[in-house]
Amino acid sequence: MKKTLVSMLTLAVLLGSLSLNAQTTDIKPPKNSILSGQQQIMNEKAPSPLPPIDESNVMWKKTVIREIDFRQKINQVFYYPINPTEDWRNLITVIYDGINSGDITPYRVENNIDDMVTPLTRDDFEKENVKVGDPPVIWNEELGTEVPNEIAFKDRMLNVTRLRIKEDWYFDKKMSQFLVRIIALGPIVVDDDGGLSQVCWIPYEPSRPVLAKAFAFNRNNSAQRRTYDEVLQKRIFDSYIIKEENVYDRYINSYAFNIDALYESERIKNEMFDFEQSLWEY
């Protein structure tokens, strides 16, 4: 009789434990927003295809480099949030995550040229962009080898407050349109001494699948979600030209200073606008 009672009690305890485990397994994580499922939808999204360019139809082209300052209100979507959340990551975090996953390949900033020539591995990228004064590598006791100093690297990446965009403006005579095509992105770090340093070049076209799956914060309506690719393609930012292609290969700040540099930037922009208008007859 006692054995039967003990067996029944043991069975009851086991059944209760299984029931509790089943209930625990069935518990779903709470939603942080009514739009919490939007990121999963975005993970399947591909960037909008760009029209192919027939080089024989390009009758005019100018390459310019412009700079986006994240301190401007309209451009703050590129800098915030500093700490990633379920739905939002700032642009440099999106780029770094893409480099970590192998979906984005950074290129070294070469001396005196703005072309992408030398690709960087993730380790090389981190070593070359640690905070000034910190060692690029540290000793890892577990691995028994030197590894990139990720703490110093991430500390420096917090100071990415500008973005350079290299782009080609061109006139397609077949389509009769004045168009622009982004070539590369260049994050800019403000160092402790106030100097500006470009950390790398990111080729835009191969990076679009990553940028098209990351939301940029919409301060006016968080239900209308835009990706970083859409923000860049739709030109939802403010910027100023810092260089146009020229025979001396000079940046504006090498021959114009302070207010004169702004005037020169506006002159280049107006010159491009006037060229487009001069193509039409009214």
Model-identified regions with their sequence ranges:
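Bacterial Sec-dependent N-terminal signal peptides
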Residues: 1-31
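Mid-length scaffold segments of soluble, non-membrane domains
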Residues: 138, 157, 178, 193-195
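Extracytoplasmic
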Residues: 158-160, 180-182, 197-199
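A domain-level signal for the mature, folded cores of soluble proteins
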Residues: 23-171, 205-282
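Short conserved micro-motifs at the rims of enzyme active sites and ligand-binding pockets
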Residues: 17, 176, 213-215
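Short, solvent-exposed beta-strand/turn "edge" segments of beta-rich domains on protein surfaces
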Residues: 172-178
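KE-rich/KEKE low-complexity, intrinsically disordered/coiled-coil-prone tracts
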Residues: 190-193, 201, 212-214
